[in-house]
């Protein structure tokens, strides 16, 4: 028995089905089936834990409020105590490219509410929930707050955000860095052929908008993959290379390459899978208009695919005589190492 049988003969999901929610940037349901019995619970639990604990994000680390020495103060003309303001600041959702720490400021006069949308951001910081109310000002009141923003993972308590040389008036804030807000999963029975006891894993993921749910799951899976590599203590035996006759084709053999081997974003790859576009030969025959009619497929994904095809000397809207060949799966396997 070859060692490869330990993993090669296990059933694997045909594809990951992604169903976006009302806001595709924040909500999605992902389904993987069929899985070996017990794998639904194993993978669902592992992915959920990593999603909630280990993805990088941005959050407010501390705040300085003009005229305030500590968080147990009150501010003239401001209806909320500083403690309540700090709790509201903790709920600010941010997206930031690059590394921190960075600064952002809010300055406003009353009367009226001060919201996260009033914050003056710099560089690559984006406030994802601008309607979040931070405090309420009476007529004639004024407030100025300066925030320190940083990147990290998981949850960091305010005490850990206080530097040893913190100046008077610096108020540390609990930081929720994780871009993932909620994750739930369920495991159901599913069938494959005549076998009824395989697993179907359904995951529901909600993010703060800094990352899409499908990308979040992809990153979590990559983290698990990287952590598990240390347990693999062997190298797979190399396949024996046999000389075979390669038939002449009426089309570019690169068309036999599967689209899931292209370096595409998770969203673009899933759109192609959901539209049953398996091979590059299927893809290049599509026009731009046809691609844009694909559900959840936008201009950004279109430009990404056009760029990848251009690097191969290909483009959309090509005519491919003799496509698809009758024995496409066999041909694709034979040409796998030749392009």
From Swiss-Prot:
Gene Ontology BP terms: DNA-templated transcription
Cited function: DNA-dependent RNA polymerase catalyzes the transcription of DNA into RNA using the four ribonucleoside triphosphates as substrates.
Subunit structure: Homodimer. The RNAP catalytic core consists of 2 alpha, 1 beta, 1 beta' and 1 omega subunit. When a sigma factor is associated with the core the holoenzyme is formed, which can initiate transcription.
Region annotated Alpha N-terminal domain (alpha-NTD), chain positions: 1-235
Chain intervals for the UniProt region annotation (Alpha C-terminal domain (alpha-CTD)): 251-339
An example Gene Ontology molecular-function term: DNA-directed RNA polymerase activity
Record InterPro entries: DNA-dir_RNA_pol_insert, DNA-dir_RNA_pol_RpoA/D/Rpb3, DNA-dir_RpoA, RBP11-like, RNAP_asu_C, RNApol_insert_sf
UniProt domain comment: The N-terminal domain is essential for RNAP assembly and basal transcription, whereas the C-terminal domain is involved in interaction with transcriptional regulators and with upstream promoter elements.
Reaction(s) this enzyme catalyzes, per UniProt: RNA(n) + a ribonucleoside 5'-triphosphate = RNA(n+1) + diphosphate
Family: Belongs to the RNA polymerase alpha chain family.
Example of a GO cellular component annotation carried by this entry: cytoplasm
Pfam family, one: RNA_pol_L
Entry superkingdom: Bacteria
Protein name (database record): DNA-directed RNA polymerase subunit alpha
UniProt-listed Enzyme Commission number(s): 2.7.7.6
KW Amino-acid biosynthesis (keyword) present: no
Protein keywords: DNA-directed RNA polymerase, Nucleotidyltransferase, Transcription, Transferase
